[in-house]
Amino acid sequence: MANAWRTARVFISSTFRDMHSERDYLVKVVFPALRERLEPHRVHLVDIDLRWGITEQQSENDEVLALCLDQIDECRPFFVGLLGERYGWVPKKLPDAGSKYGWTQHQTGKSVTELEIRWGVLLGDVMRDHAFFYFRDPAFLNDVPPAKRTEMTSESDEAARKLAALKEVIRSAGLPNPVVEN
């Protein structure tokens, strides 16, 4: 079975509202090019972009975080993190303490994006070698039309502080792949 096809799943983590263009570029340009390069090696690449994969019912039933973390588990060891100036949505309800994701009970006030990054990369070694982080340069906002800029700026001063702290944790985590900032 040396010639059997293998599947590589890549989880894309970011806030949704401000990273549409970056996610679109990955999905429409980068991943198709990677698929082409991997096909001769019998590797099927699947990108997991949950922008369109979360239903209204899942949102209403507080299932979003568990769904995201489940998908990260399915994608191990591949993780791509995109961070701009938004911290992201903070869930009001976290998974039950007795569940697989009970560790989140001590993470009150953290965004889904931060919890994805912690679960996927920072809390274990499985994804460290295959995690890639890209931080968008805040100066980028200078070129964004004012009407769109509000969707790409921090939700609040507190959110900006949390995001800055998260970025620093990622930078200082000793990951083998350097954080790309531009």
What are these regions (language model features)?
Residues 1-182:
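Conserved catalytic or regulatory cores that recognize and/or transform ribose-phosphate-containing ligands
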